[in-house]
Amino acid sequence: MSLQGIHLSDLSYKHAILKESQYTIKRDVGTTTAVTPSSLQQEITLLCGEILYAKHADYKYAAEIGIQYISTALGSERVQQILRNSGSEVQVVLTRTYSLGKVKNNKGEDLQMLDIHGVEKSWVEEIDKEARKTMATLLKESSGNIPQNQRPSAPDTPIILLCVGALIFTKLASTIEVGLETTVRRANRVLSDALKRYPRMDIPKIARSFYDLFEQKVYYRSLFIEYGKALGSSSTGSKAESLFVNIFMQAYGAGQTMLRWGVIARSSNNIMLGHVSVQAELKQVTEVYDLVREMGPESGLLHLRQSPKAGLLSLANCPNFASVVLGNASGLGIIGMYRGRVPNTELFSAAESYAKSLKESNKINFSSLGLTDEEKEAAEHFLNVSDDSQNDYE
């Protein structure tokens, strides 16, 4: 593997080719998917809460239910427009309700269940049944004193569910084993408050459901991105919504999901960003910022204007080709040596070779990387840069 052929000058040519396209690609022709109207948001919210509230045997549709909440939040017409804009020709089937007949709710009315296209009715019924059984048991144990925010009907349960989706969304470029392991570890930390409220929430199985869904229904990624941007632009929101936006913007802004070509950013932007992360020359950084301004928030690179170093350090541990370029900081010793581990030996070897060739041609500009003294010392030691020659690289 070699990085020598990647040059920033390729950017304008590649970007021009992409801009000149007069055509769009049609995908998912003949496929169907569920869309839930806003009028059923309360029912979807309750189903999300029931998924979190009890321990279930099967979570395979958990992610689909979370996406259906997004559908109710954006509105069915906007959802269809987002899917069309993403190039998807998938046909939508509106969610409906049906009566279970003999089963009554606590008001003595026929219990209404959701009929969601592609989701087995028996699965929905079993989720509801298990949640009600758990609720009955806990009511007896607590003499009826279950706080509202620990019940399945709590209004923020869909957002908690989607937080797991946002965590797995940042790992779509990883292998499933690495992605799930990292997601579960992070979720146990960032969702600690939610886990106290819903201790039976099965994060590993919910995360697996989201991973599988984003792989099977790629068009849902566009829907997820638009929802995250819409929620992030809202002036008010709950604590759970703020947490979701924070997780989402780390994925959208820090560039981890950009590594999945076609998800957020064009491949040419990935190459450009990676080249700057290696050479970090002021002229090239300026070119990056100019492109960011031109493309606006759609570029997903705006975080670089505020925190260039954070952007570099967040892009080093992903397993595909684009990350070889983006992860060149590991070749400087900032990631691979500074953390004392090598997550990808092939990536590290290529980055090491490239970084040393840049050192020999005096192209590494440490000052524009904004390193801490400890990081800078690690990089200089790794590249054998002496104090006498240090100025050659600054």
Curated annotation (Swiss-Prot):
Gene name of the record: N
Pfam annotation, one family: Pneumo_ncap
Coiled-coil annotated residue ranges, if any: none
Location in the cell: Virion; Host cytoplasm
Keyword match Protease: no
Subunit structure: Homomultimerizes to form the nucleocapsid. Binds to viral genomic RNA. Interacts with the phosphoprotein P. When in a monomeric RNA-free form, interacts with the phosphoprotein (via N-terminus). Interacts with protein M2-1; this interaction allows the association of nucleocapsid with the matrix protein.
Function: Encapsidates the viral RNA genome by forming a left-handed helical nucleocapsid that protects the RNA from nucleases. RNA replication depends on the availability of soluble nucleoprotein. The encapsidated genomic RNA is termed the NC and serves as template for transcription and replication.
GO terms of molecular function: RNA binding
Key words, A-Z: Capsid protein, Helical capsid protein, Host cytoplasm, Ribonucleoprotein, RNA-binding, Viral nucleoprotein, Virion
Organism name: Human metapneumovirus (strain CAN97-83) (HMPV)
Annotated protein name in UniProt: Nucleoprotein
Family listed: Belongs to the paramyxoviruses nucleocapsid family.
A GO cellular component annotation in the UniProt record: ribonucleoprotein complex
